[in-house]
Amino acid sequence: SLGLYLAESLGPDPRMAEIIVERVQSLGLSNETESPTNEERGPTGVLVVKAGTKNQYDDCLWFQDLGRMVENRLGLGYAVAVAQSHYGDPTVDDAATRLVEERGVARIVVVPYLFFPGLILKRNILGGMDRIAQSHPTVSLSVTPPLGVDDRIVAVAADRIRQVWDRVEG
């Protein structure tokens, strides 16, 4: 008989957080935490955006955990929020507004939590950035490349598969 087994998601894995941090750092933005002007500018906002889901069971708690991991790794001078590109909460607009109004950011780096560029990136994420620019015209916006192909993602996926086999064979 054929058995179907569900593995855990990539979820809030430190390796995934590390990739996101590298995407932010790849832009070469200076984090001026020691600069006297930083008080006026506030921290750099990082908005990690995943594909939206209509799944009623995806409460995005795992994604919020991942966002906290990223903020802890980036350290002082950064404020991280997470959002869904469409269909669900938190929305790109709401998360960006929280970064600006509650965390005081003057710059937002958007990190697409996607494996490759495509329709979701073009229509939903970049479209969301257009809305952010209209709502918050003084906020500087930039976007990193998607996660792409990375050995750490492969390692996380392999770990999830091994966990399933361990349960099945154990």
Where are these regions (language model features)?
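Extended amphipathic ligand-handling, pore-lining, and cofactor/metal-binding catalytic surfaces
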Residues: S1-G170
